[in-house]
């Protein structure tokens, strides 16, 4: 499992290398400018030795790190040369990660009977049918009110509507599957019949997901990372799914926000869950990933993820980001949930610049406009 690491400056690189146990000044500033740095995660000492032996003739540096990782410093031209002359599976992983990271083409995202073109950023509008969600709790308990919001989001340019019946904010209490389904059942059916857009069901319960998919939803947004029977439901119903990173439960997830390397640890979790889902029969093209901002992360962890979102693209799966109105934005910019629009749009622009594909948001119109501008600036091509 490989992921491409891009450093913004030498101080950032040196700080991380020191934290991961890489010898001081193992690389120079010239190395930082001339080489591609690729982490290989979940690697044994024997595999590191084999990599060092394989790549030594090409004068490629391979260093072991804390946390069962290795760091490879290689020029893209050298990597291409190694791949063309035959390479081990680990080196093949490096080539694949670099190809995905450089976005040769956008990843496919499909479900039974449909697909979504990710050649431009896509917006997922939040429709919480809950009394206690952190931002819009209580606004859509009535199916008519929920429908009005769904239609308004459609007019504003939303691409997916994400319907949820359980709050998963930090410290929230769980509801029963029956309670969750009773909240969203009419909304899922009506939005499916009357709005004409793909519907995602935001749930961590397989029984709720199955009912929603049979009522018209086409994808599952699962904050628990496809656990406890969810893989089977997604496979059997031909749905797409987003795999999110979280530790623990919403009620206790903020009790432990410590990581060796937050992005590396999140990446390893997501890659493992994607691999398990594919092994269980879900086509890879039906899976997206979400780093889970605010779920078992503190402010610094969230900011580190925001600054390194491009690494997630090394997996070759669509990246979904849920930064909208999150508490960490309030802690750095001030304001309650209703006062975080500007910070939310800043997060969307930063993520767009790093190639994030989908954005789960409360403020559809403003986000659509921000992404249109940010995408045009990133590509240098005006929108058609």
Predicted regions and their residues:
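Non-catalytic propeptide/linker segments at domain boundaries
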Residues: 68-114
